Amino acid sequence: KVESLLEKQISKLRSQGAKDMDNALMVVQNPKNGDILAIAGKQIDKQGKLKDYDIGNFTAQYTVGSSVKGGTLLAGYQNKAINVGETMVDEPLKFQGGLTKRSYFNKNGHVSIDDKQALMHSSNVYMFKTALKLAGDPYTSGMSLPNNIADAGRKLRKGLNQVGLGLKTGI
C-alpha cells in the first residue's frame, strides 16, 4: 500500500511540473516508539519509468532542510528562549557584512506569525530568530552573527535529537 501511495504521489507531482525529481523515498514509523512500519522507495530512470529503490532510504544522503524546524522550536521551548504561541515578525533579516536571510513564503514583507504558523509556512526567519535567542543574542537589524555558539549548538542538537535527528537508527 505504501508503494502504491508513493507511485500516485510521484505521478501527481510530475504532472504538476516536477520534472527534475529523480527519486522519492518514504519511511513510515510508529510515532510512539519509533518502530519502522514500512519503507518504500522509487527511482525514476531516464525513460521516466519507476524502479524500486527501497535501498535509497539507507544509502542516499540529503540535506535535512525543514525537518529541523520542529526540533528547533522544541529546543527554544525547553531552554526558555521562546514560548509556545510566541509571535515574531517574519521579515528579511539583515546582518553585518550584507548577509540577508529570508523565508521563501515571505521574501520582502513583514508578517507577524506564531510558532504554529512558522511550522505551517516553514518560516526560516522564525527559526533563525529562535536560534539567535538560544545563543542569547536576539536579532537586531545589522547585527553581526554571534561567535560563541557552542552552548547554543548543544541546546539545538539536544532538541533535534529528541525528534530523532542526528541519532543512529539501529538499522
Name each model-derived stretch.
Residues 6, 18-60, 74-171:
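Beta-lactam-recognizing serine transpeptidase/beta-lactamase-like catalytic domain environment
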Residues 11-19:
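Active-site phosphate-binding and catalytic loops of NTP-dependent enzymes
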Residues 65-74:
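Active/ligand-binding-proximal structured segments within catalytic/core domains
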Residues 1-12:
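N-terminal leader/targeting segments and the immediately adjacent pre-domain N-terminus
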